[in-house]
Regions:
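Short recognition patches in nucleic-acid-associated and regulatory proteins
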Residues: 79-118, 132-135, 141-142
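Short, intrinsically disordered terminal segments enriched in charged and Pro/Gly residues
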Residues: 9, 24, 138-147
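Amphipathic alpha-helical scaffolding segments comprising HEAT/armadillo-like alpha-solenoid repeats
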Residues: 1-10, 29-51
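Short inter-helical turns and helix N-cap capping residues of alpha-solenoid HEAT/ARM repeat scaffolds
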Residues: 14-16, 46-50, 58
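Structural detector for internal amphipathic alpha-helices that build alpha-solenoid repeat scaffolds
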Residues: 20-31, 52-71
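Short Cys/His-rich metal-coordination motifs, predominantly Zn2+-binding knuckles/fingers
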Residues: 84-86, 123-126
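Alpha-helix initiation and capping sites
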Residues: 15-16, 30-35, 74-77
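Generic helix N-cap/helix-start motif at coil->alpha-helix transitions
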Residues: 1-2, 15-21
Length: 147
């Protein structure tokens, strides 16, 4: 079974744990093969997940599913570079994206407000420059702004 098939089965399963784990993976993927395979199923996934309580404490886990669906629809519509979605999902760690080759590190410094580290990065696909600030409030998250 392919990775895309396994993710699709999880997302259609009705099992909150499987949906959550797979939605988190889809929400951050840049893999064209996964996106090509899953994007046509976005509406089906949304229908299958309707009414499934995904839980969450400070942040509803539904945010991961919504971000995954948004990513699939954006890809399907060929709306542009996937980096445009980074500000809409708090869990894009610029260090991971640099490791994956999706972003290039331009510089690192302190955040303008003194809270957190600021990474200046550029998308390796489209060249868009981003200012990404490490944030934390019960869990780490990242604030992405066009530079």
């Amino acid at each position: 079974m392919s990775a895309a098939d396994a993710l699709l089965q999880d997302l259609l399963s009705g099992d909150a744990t499987r949906i959550h784990a797979s939605a988190c993976r889809v929400a951050v993927t840049f893999d064209p093969g996964l996106l090509d395979a899953l994007a046509p199923h976005a509406d089906r996934i949304e229908r299958a997940c309707a009414g499934v309580t995904l839980g969450g404490a400070l942040l509803a886990n539904q945010v991961h599913l919504q971000s995954a669906l948004k990513r699939l629809r954006y890809w399907q519509a060929q709306a542009g570079c996937l980096c445009a979605l980074t500000p809409t999902y708090l869990f894009f760690d610029p260090r991971r994206l640099i490791e994956q080759g999706q972003m290039q590190l331009l510089s690192v410094g302190d955040a303008d407000d003194g809270w957190g580290e600021c990474h200046h990065v550029a998308c390796t696909q489209c060249g868009q420059h981003w200012q990404v600030t490490d944030r934390e409030y019960h869990y780490p998250w990242w604030e992405w702004k066009v530079a």
